[in-house]
Amino acid sequence: LAASAPKVLRGKIEVRGCGILDIPYEESVSIRLVIDLVLRGDVPRVPEPASCDIAGWVLPLYRLHAFDASCPAKVRSVAMRLD
């Protein structure tokens, strides 16, 4: 399963409070996990393993709160444990 950004959005990110910024990017990437951004109260303290099906591909699913300061570190941590 692969993903790519539309040409007009490649190398751009919207950062709340800063606007649209230029960033490095990849032309295409393999999707290997799903991060579901949920309300803080919906993030389980110790979650059971979860997955979701996207176009027949079963991927690990994690529920995180986007505005927790630790969210980027959590995403990196779970991504590093794949394979």
List PLM regions with ranges.
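Conserved nucleotide-sensing/catalytic segment adjacent to the nucleotide-binding pocket
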Residues: 1-39
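Conserved NTP phosphate-binding and transfer environment spanning the P-loop NTPase/kinase superfamily
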Residues: 31-83
